Curated annotation (Swiss-Prot):
TM spans (from-to): 11-31, 81-101, 114-134, 154-174, 187-207, 238-258, 270-290, 307-327
Source organism (scientific name): Pseudomonas fluorescens (strain Pf0-1)
Enzyme class, UniProt record, top EC level: translocase
Similarity annotation: Belongs to the complex I subunit 1 family.
Catalytic activity annotation: a quinone + NADH + 5 H(+)(in) = a quinol + NAD(+) + 4 H(+)(out)
Identification of the protein by name: NADH-quinone oxidoreductase subunit H
Enzyme Commission number(s) from the entry: 7.1.1.-
Gene Ontology molecular function terms on file: NADH dehydrogenase activity; oxidoreductase activity, acting on NAD(P)H, quinone or similar compound as acceptor; quinone binding
Keywords: Cell inner membrane, Cell membrane, Membrane, NAD, Quinone, Translocase, Transmembrane, Transmembrane helix, Ubiquinone
Protein role: NDH-1 shuttles electrons from NADH, via FMN and iron-sulfur (Fe-S) centers, to quinones in the respiratory chain. The immediate electron acceptor for the enzyme in this species is believed to be ubiquinone. Couples the redox reaction to proton translocation (for every two electrons transferred, four hydrogen ions are translocated across the cytoplasmic membrane), and thus conserves the redox energy in a proton gradient. This subunit may bind ubiquinone.
Source domain of life: Bacteria
Protein encoded by which gene: nuoH
Topology class, membrane: Multi-pass membrane protein
One of the record's GO cellular component terms: plasma membrane
A biological-process GO annotation: aerobic respiration
Amino acid sequence: MTWFTPEVIDVILTVIKAIVILLAVVVAGALLSFVERRLLGWWQDRYGPNRVGPFGMFQIAADMLKMFFKEDWTPPFADKVIFTLAPVVAMSALLIAFAIIPITPTWGVADLNIGLLFFFAMAGLSVYAVLFAGWSSNNKFALLGSLRASAQTVSYEVFMGLALMGIVVQVGSFNMRDIVEYQAQNLWFIIPQFFGFCTFFIAGVAVTHRHPFDQPEAEQELADGYHIEYAGMKWGMFFVGEYIGIILISALLVTLFFGGWHGPFGILPQLSFVWFALKTAFFILLFILLRASIPRPRYDQVMDFSWKFCLPLTLINLLVTAAIVLWNTPAVAVQ
């Protein structure tokens, strides 16, 4: 009797895929910080990082070395266990959420029938990480930043979920691969669910606390917010986690609204990974462009925008989608 049964081999291959994908996401998140700084320098007509290596390409390695050798300091009056746990939860929740993304027809960590619900469960965990960081730091700026972040995230996650319910109503499934295959046979959801796409994209920027929704860490008001007391590798986990969040939301936008790994009109299906990577890179660049071009609004304006504009628009989109699906569904006679 051998240990290497087909079931065991499938488990081993799944674990290998998970390790490769998650390591690639972490490396991409670290590299994205360099890409953002270079693009911001280009768009703002100035030099970006250009001292370390050719074209500054080794700047990220220098930053990582500096971060690694910095003192791993913990405030004396902080709750040390929760203070240490917060960055671990923040980064782990984002990496685990990435497990549901089908990158190609054969590459993906988990094919869950509750894929979308799993994503929202992991997104909810990130709220706890921010609260842990703010409360355990024993710093008023950190606490205020964490309260802002939790209120903003919870508010925008409400209609983030409602924005995707129109897709679920049309497909009849929470499975990510089912959603991608439905788009291959029909229109990409960017067309029938355009308003759902707009509200989901806005919510994605807000949930990742990216500019212009970076109120929880507004330097002018809160002195860097909930991670003001963090240094060294703990701060680095928050820093890289933010870029992993950008990659996650961009990959979700591609999967849910732009056909996933499929090219436009089914062109070159053998280049599934290339299509997925190109579309994801486009949205990552859009995240960076928002930082370079839009001013930061006041916090009350951010919250009013979510409840008074985005939520009604999302509800109208969901109701119209449900009405159209019911209208096109043939009636079933009751025996």
